[in-house]
Amino acid sequence: MLVHPEAMSVGALADKIRKIENWPQKGILFHDITPVLQSAEYFRLLVDLLVYRYMDQKIDIVAGLDARGFIIGAALAYQLNVGFVPIRKKGKLPFETVSQSYALEYGEAAVEIHTDAVKLGSRVLLVDDLVATGGTMLAGLELIRKLGGEIVEAAAILEFTDLQGGKNIRASGAPLFTLLQNEGCMKG
């Protein structure tokens, strides 16, 4: 049973996100979505808000980014009655993969997807918990494109607007939807 999104405000989700100062390092205000996931009411609200947005968009598959994108994406795929594809950190998938690197603050990382995960022309929704600099999301989008998928949209719960990730994603040609926007995760 879907909860109509007007039944509760998106602001209620924002209130449920826990803020933790100086984690994972000094100067960062971490936004922890686990309280949303722990609450049946708020987890349902989160998924239902996304279901209502995408239920008429003819999505073939939902892809989720490691790791919180798995939780949201799999629940959303289930409700949309489509398959789910994990995009994992490099070295975690057992079958043949394609990889995409992205920049970190100090260095580089990579994500991978199975080569048979997205069929040519499939309409794909990419999901993660948040968008900061956009590096992971951009890498995921590039993987989907490499496999011939069509990006319906990239979606996240939260976007840190001051870090320009959303702007970078949109500049790549992918539409981006976020339920919440915040000025940033830098403390003080």
Swiss-Prot record:
One of its GO terms (cellular component) is cytoplasm. The keyword Glycosyltransferase applies. It comes from the Bacteria. Pathway: Purine metabolism; AMP biosynthesis via salvage pathway; AMP from adenine: step 1/1. It catalyses: AMP + diphosphate = 5-phospho-alpha-D-ribose 1-diphosphate + adenine. The keyword Cytoplasm applies. InterPro entries: Ade_phspho_trans, PRibTrfase_dom, PRTase-like, UPRTase/APRTase. Catalyzes a salvage reaction resulting in the formation of AMP, that is energically less costly than de novo synthesis. This is Adenine phosphoribosyltransferase. The gene is apt.
